[in-house]
Amino acid sequence: MNRQRTTGLLATIVLLASLGSACSKGDDKAVKGRNGPNGAAHDTVSDLSLNEDGLGQIQIGMNLDDAVNMGLLNENPTMNKQCDYVFPAVGAGIPEGVSAMVVRGKIVRIDVDTGTVTTEDGAKIGDTEDRIKSIYGNDVTIEPHTLIDGGHYMTVLGDSASAGKALVFETEGQHVARFRAGRLPEVKWVSGCS
């Protein structure tokens, strides 16, 4: 009887340990996966990429207060409520060179001015205009830059899931100097909130 009890207890311990291990593996995937409860689409900062809908957990259309409460963006106490920029919170894991345009409390655009952020298709600062054309093909429209002689705005409208949103690459004529993603019309505002 004592031996049966010991064997049963040992089997229960092994079963509980197996379940605990399986649950913790699933939790990692739930948090890191695109459909996870926190909406994280990337496992590391190195593969954080911009698309028409946002950058990681910072989503176009999101309330600024929500992004601040999640520790993604800093508050701006002197913010112009009509239109202003905010920057990533320290420790948020967002690379330098990223800012978010906020209009009436909503994130409407994310700008990348420097750094290592790429689009989900791999486009980045320093790419040639030809590379942008090769990535986006007929989806890219090219217009003359209003502030840089010889420069261009290369705009890629979002697909049906991202209707009303776009990516905009600014070039000095040959290379991407900066790019952004967001909703129309704000993503096409040439001078930001000015």
Predicted regions located by residue number:
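A cross-family detector of function-defining hotspots
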Residues: 31, 63-103, 129-175, 181
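Bacterial signal peptide processing site
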Residues: 24-26
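Short, low-complexity, Pro/Ser/Thr/Gly-rich segments in the mature regions of secreted, periplasmic
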Residues: 182-194
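Bacterial N-terminal signal peptides that target proteins for export
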Residues: 1-10
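Glycine-centered tight-turn and secondary-structure capping sites
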Residues: 61, 120, 124-127
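N-terminal low-complexity, Pro/Thr/Ser-rich intrinsically disordered segments
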Residues: 31-62
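Short, recurring structural edge motifs at helix starts
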Residues: 51-57, 116-121, 156
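C-terminal motif of bacterial Sec signal peptides marking the signal peptidase cleavage site
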Residues: 19-22
